[in-house]
Amino acid sequence: MGKRLLDKLWERHVVATNENGLDLLYIDLHLVHEVTSPQAFEGLRLTNRTVRRPDLTFATMDHNIPTKDVWNITDRIAKQQLDTLRENCKQFQVPLADIGDEEQGIVHVIGPELGLTQPGKTIVCGDSHTATHGAFGALAFGIGTSEVEHVLATQTLWQRKPKAMGIELKGKLQKGVYAKDIILHLLSKYGVAVGTGYVMEFYGETIQAMEMEERMTLCNMAIEGGAKAGIIAPDEKTVAYVKGRKYAPKDYETFEKKWSELYTDADAMYDLHISIDVTDLAPYVTWGTNPSMGVRIDEKLPEKHDVNDERAFSYMGLSPGQSTYDIPVQHVFIGSCTNSRLSDLEIAASVVKGRKVKEGVRALVVPGSKRVRDAAMQKGLHHIFEEAGFEWREPGCSMCLGMNPDQVPEGEHCASTSNRNFEGRQGKGARTHLVSPAMAAAAALYGHFVDIRKESYDGAISYS
């Protein structure tokens, strides 16, 4: 019997196995940010320990930083967390991408762009969306603060091996339909618990056609389906993406050979298998308070089936049978570790070029990193956004979560390219709708959702 990609990644990192069936995994890369690390570093101090492998640890500031004026941090707790991370990294000799550094950005954006993320690695971070890095054929997952301390101290982690789920994606996406729509479709069909106890492996002709940044979007939201991680076998596109980046391997040919072995064998069996044909897939919009509460843009909102639906409709101020086109949009957020990379910004810019944001709509573009921001500005994207009426911000997690000044007011609706739409996620009483960058950009122009596949809806939508 052949091996799955998960098996190969797991077996390469098992240091020991205990009597309870838990495996001690060696961790190749530990990513750190300001929110989940303070107690972990303090735990090292209290036990007089050091960071075992500072060279395999990398920290950045992302969750709490303001994106309008990065140096003016008025929130006392946010400032304390940022200052604490700076002090901890200095004391324990951990590399830090500080505010203003060219390497600073959202942790799951800078890992790949710096070449820290590589095929075959085990990668952890005190953040749910660590699964993003699985797009490179890495086993990457989020951990809690006590586990952050364990990895800092030992460079290992006790884990129970998950089961393997194969998700085959077949067909070619229509124009205006993206990886974000695939994952929202998957969640709407199978729910937020389908992946519980599993690692999702995405594969198939649709994956082969995708560029790396869309693959990252898919893996990023595997956690929203309950999965431990999302993974994609590395291929030529993966190798080309990593090659030449700052922290990429210098002995490239040796690593490339090892990476070529990372795939699921033809005779291997998944514990669970799902097949999706994306040919007729449409853009998706979430209407409720978890990522599985989504519909195609050309569908009506569903009927109420249980108390959860009842509560979601009430919180969102929407009704069963309502058209998605009738959902008002007062805020637009293009950013987050899901959709803030250069290709995401290029797609959004192509939609709004030469157009104007609807009066009464507040629209933000927040690049995922300093490097993304600089690259976008070199292409003139900031001019396109600003001329359209968008705010062009500094990199950070921003409006994805209500931990910094970028928040949605109570009772107002936001078209967001982020990954979670829970109650209060973007601020107290905020109503979040998850969409692709193209859909978010179009919503900014009209003040409601439109079908980006159509060249006109109340007027022309520019694609160039």
UniProtKB/Swiss-Prot annotation:
InterPro entries: 3-IsopropMal_deHydase_lsu, Acnase/IPM_dHydase_lsu_aba_1/3, Acoase/IPM_deHydtase_lsu_aba, Aconitase_4Fe-4S_BS, Aconitase_4Fe-4S_dom, IPM_dehydratase_rel_enz, IPMI_cat. GO terms for biological process: L-leucine biosynthetic process. The keyword Membrane does not apply. It holds the Pfam family Aconitase. Binds 1 [4Fe-4S] cluster per subunit. Pathway: Amino-acid biosynthesis; L-leucine biosynthesis; L-leucine from 3-methyl-2-oxobutanoate: step 2/4. Keywords: 4Fe-4S, Amino-acid biosynthesis, Branched-chain amino acid biosynthesis, Iron, Iron-sulfur, Leucine biosynthesis, Lyase, Metal-binding. One of its GO terms (molecular function) is metal ion binding. Its EC number is 4.2.1.33. It catalyses: (2R,3S)-3-isopropylmalate = (2S)-2-isopropylmalate. CDD domains: IPMI. It is an enzyme of class 4 (lyase). Gene3D superfamilies: Aconitase, domain 3. The keyword Amino-acid biosynthesis applies. [4Fe-4S] cluster binds at C337, C397, C400. Its cofactor is [4Fe-4S] cluster. NCBIfam families: leuC (TIGR00170), PRK05478.1 (NF004016), PRK12466.1 (NF009116). Catalyzes the isomerization between 2-isopropylmalate and 3-isopropylmalate, via the formation of 2-isopropylmaleate. Heterodimer of LeuC and LeuD. Belongs to the aconitase/IPM isomerase family. LeuC type 1 subfamily. PANTHER family: 3-ISOPROPYLMALATE DEHYDRATASE, HOMOACONITASE, MITOCHONDRIAL-RELATED. HAMAP family: LeuC_type1. This is 3-isopropylmalate dehydratase large subunit. It comes from Bacillus cereus (strain ATCC 10987 / NRS 248). The gene is leuC.
